[in-house]
Amino acid sequence: MSTLSEDLTPRPAALPAGSGVVATARVRAGHNGHVTTLPLLSSDGPFHLQRLRPRGGMARVDVIGAMSGPLGGDRLALHADAGPHARLQITAAASTIALRGPTDAPATYDIHLTVGDDATLHWLPQPLISTAGSNLRQTFTVELAPTARLVLRDEQILGRTNETSGNLTTRLTVLRAGRPLLDQHTSYGDPHPAWDGPAVMGSHRACGQLLVVAPSLAPAAHPPVLLGDPDTPAHGALAPLAGPALLATAVADTATQLRYLLDEALRRTLTP
């Protein structure tokens, strides 16, 4: 895992024309002075966007997979925009499964999140499963206004039961008020060297992170802390960033263990 300081705008890989599905889904939330509204819900390709009943003052959208994907050669994107004062939560009905496709070209899945002044966005999907033989490049690009609030959960399962991981590359780039807050680039599976060595995953096959950004967060009040029980095969850490933000990273043997650690991290961020 490496943290980068240059070239902060991820660039999707160029793929041959006609090599797979090309689709972009879009969500836009606004605030009309009373409640959060959803003036734009645009489904496309494998993404079906389902409006859910609001909860706790938040508009909610569920992403439902309408077809298999991403497959090799697909170019998929999802854009979500929470306008000023809007409160939006995005979840997923099921895991995203990266599969081998009809072409050797990689699939790309680009997620772009924009959060305006005094707006809140919770991005809480189910895990991404990288199956054997798949080849996926996933990017998150997050742009936050100075007073924006964000909760972002990102989980990967490297291979199904008794299966090796596919070729998975992920990048998370977060800008706050136009300045870099986090830029993280990680690669798993062949041909990436040492991804399953002790410095990265070891024997674990589930990994993830939770990022919480809020103007009210005081990093000094949240010193780094270890997550989980040292005697269990699940480990993590919660640490402050150079800004009003906390980042939890964790590895585990199963998706259930991983979610437990990230939920623990979220509880700790909500504790003064």
Describe these PLM feature segments.
Residues S2, E6, A14-G18, V22-T24, ...:
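N-terminal intrinsically disordered, cationic/polar leader segments
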Residues S2-P127, A132:
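N-terminal, charged/glycine-rich beta-strand/loop interface patches
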Residues F47-R51, L99-D104, G133-N135, T161-S165, ...:
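A short, polar/proline- and glycine-enriched secondary-structure boundary/capping micro-motif
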Residues R75-A77, R137, A245:
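Intrinsic-disorder/low-complexity, polar/charged segments enriched in Ser/Thr/Lys/Arg/Asp/Glu/Gln
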Residues I90, L150-R153:
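Short, hydrophobic/aromatic beta-strand segments
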Residues D154-P272:
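A structural signal for small-residue-enriched, beta-sheet-centric alpha/beta enzyme cores
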